[in-house]
Amino acid sequence: MTNETSTADKAETTDETPGGSKRPGRTARHWRAGFLRGGIELRHLLRNPKEMSGHLSNVVVALLIGAYLSDDVPGTHTPMAHLVLAGFAAYLLFQIGLINLPQILVTEREEGALLRLRATPGGIPAYLIAKCLLVVVMATGTLALLLAAAALLVDGPLPRGPGDWLTLLWVTTLGLLAVVPLGAAIGAVLPNPREALALIMLPTMALLFTSGAVFPITSLPVPVQQVASVFPLKWMAQGLRSALLPDSARAAEVAGSWELPMVALVLTAWTVLGFLLAVPLLRRAARRESGSRLTARHRRAARSGAMPA
C-alpha cells in the first residue's frame, strides 16, 4: 500500500501514552486505528482516477441498459427498465463486496500488507474495520449515484415513501454485511490478483443472470431459481425491488410477494457465515506470511512481468 497506509500501520502499535497514563481500551484502539486507516484509503481511492472510473463505468452500463429497454415486466405494468435498474443496484453492492474487496486483499497481501499486520498489535481487527469503511463508502456512493442518475436521465425508480426508504436502508446495510465478510474470507485464500479476478468473475456473472437481477426470476427454470435462492444476490435484488418498485410488481416474484422476512433471514445467515470465516482465515493468512514467501512471490511476479507496484 501507500506510505500513508504504512503510517496507519505504525499508529496501531501505540499501546500507552507517554508518562505512563492509562492506555485506552483495546477495542477503542482497534476502532480508532481502523477509522484512521480507512480514511487514508478513502483519500487514496478518490485520488485514483483509474479506480474511480471502474465504478463509474458500471453505473454507465446500467443507465444504458435502462435507456434501451422499453417493455413492461410480463404480467405487470412495471417497466422492465425499472426491474433491471433495481437488479443492477443490488449487483453493484454484491460486486463491490465479492469482486473488488477480494482483489484489494489479494493485491495488498502480495505487497506485504499482511506481513506488516503480524507485527501490529490488533492489526487484523483494525484492518477489517478499515476495509469495511472503505467498502461501505464505495457501495453507498455508487448506489446513490446510480439511483440519482437513473431518476434524472432515464426516469428510473426511487422509493415512494418513508417505509420504502427504510427498506432500502436496511436491505443495503444487511446486504453489505452479508457480502463484505464473505469477500474478505475469499480474499484471504485466493492466489495472485490476476487469478483471483478469473476465479471470482465467472461465478458472480453467473449469479447476475440467474438471480432475477436482469430478468424476472419467474422466467427462469425452477432448478435455477432454487440454486439462486441459496445465494445472497437473489435476496438483495428482491429486497431492493420491494423498495423501488410498486406493489403490483410482486406478481413477477416467485411467491407473489416480496418475502421481506425471508430476505432478512437469508442475508443474516450469510452475514454470520461470513464473519465466522473471515477473521480466522485472515489471521491464518497473516500467520503464514513471511519475508521469504513475500520475496519469492515478488521474484515470480518479476519474471512474469506483473511485479506489484
Regions found by a protein language model. Name each.
Residues T2, E12-N58, G291, P308:
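Aromatic- and glycine-rich beta-strand/loop motifs that create alpha-glucan
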Residues H77-I104, V171-L176, P181, A188, ...:
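Hydrophobic alpha-helical transmembrane segments of membrane proteins
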